Regions:
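Positively charged n-region of N-terminal signal peptides that target proteins for export
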Residues: 1-6
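Bacterial N-terminal signal peptides
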Residues: 8-18
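Sequence context surrounding c-type heme c attachment/ligation sites in exported
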Residues: 21-119
């Protein structure tokens, strides 16, 4: 599944394999507070795919709103980074880069930790 629009990138991650998705977004600090359940699920699925992780990488099982996992704070910082990159796209990249390519996957490429470039 490819995400075409991540409303404000990166907080928690995807559906639990064992049992569904939180009904409502709680403790949303970076994503829009009025995000729909469907858009939140789509966004979380996108994060999971782009980083190759499951929900529990950032979330406490069945308590998505908790901030007990360090990766959740990291995720919020990374969402802000992507938001900034999108806001300053022309400054960073010029007209040749479309906003749609500025995602978590741009650097992570399916891995929780981006691999450094080695020439």
């Amino acid at each position: 599944m490819r995400i075409k629009s991540i409303p404000t990138l990166f907080v928690a991650l995807s559906l639990l394999a064992s049992g569904g998705f939180a009904a409502e977004g709680k403790n949303l600090q970076v994503l829009p507070k009025d995000i729909t359940k469907d858009e939140l699920k789509k966004t979380m699925d996108g994060f999971a795919e782009q980083l190759g992780v499951k929900c529990t990488f950032c979330h406490v099982l069945e308590q998505y709103e908790k901030d007990d996992r360090p990766h959740k704070a990291d995720a919020r910082r990374m969402i802000k980074l992507v938001q900034d990159m999108k806001a300053k796209k022309a400054e960073y990249y010029g007209p040749r880069v479309k906003e749609a390519v500025i995602t978590c996957g741009m650097c992570h490429r399916g891995k929780a930790e981006p691999e450094p470039f080695v020439p």
